Amino acid sequence: VYVGTVTGKLKSLLDKTASWLHRPPAVGLPVLPLVTTAGSGKKQTMAYLSEAVTYWGAHPLKGIGRTASDRKPIEIPELEPFLRCLHLPKERYAPSMHQVVFFQVQKVLALKVAEIDRVFWRDKGWDNMDYYFPCRISLIKRLAGKLLFAVLYRRIKPSGTF
């Protein structure tokens, strides 16, 4: 953590992944954010990293953070949710409402804004999906996602080919 968020070098790296928001390369991969700080900013940085990997199609887990005064090593119980997720079949994964909503927003943008994204999403079959892959999505999340998609799809005008 640097000045309450990610360091400049990490921010620069994350900025270079901007196209991944449109053509996510890490779909279905679990990510364990790790944060260290001298004092404050751990929670905000963890949230920032979790949001960034959500853009990539990954699913962030509860991260592990340490401050300078907390030098205890990472314990197995802290890693267990991540280890379980590594072995979880995709069909049993349950995305959050945020992930379902973000997927639908990405889908509308892919289908309406840029030809390169439209082709990518259609090749993956995501243009007809409720989420990147078949998984456990509650009825409420599924309906909210479909409603959001329908509203945005009607409102966003196609912007040509680029």
Kindly give the residue locations of the regions a language model identified.
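Helix-loop-strand module that forms the ligand-binding subsite of alpha/beta enzymes
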Residues: 1-59, 130, 135, 139
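Glycine-rich phosphate/pyrophosphate-binding loop and the adjoining helix
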Residues: 59-162
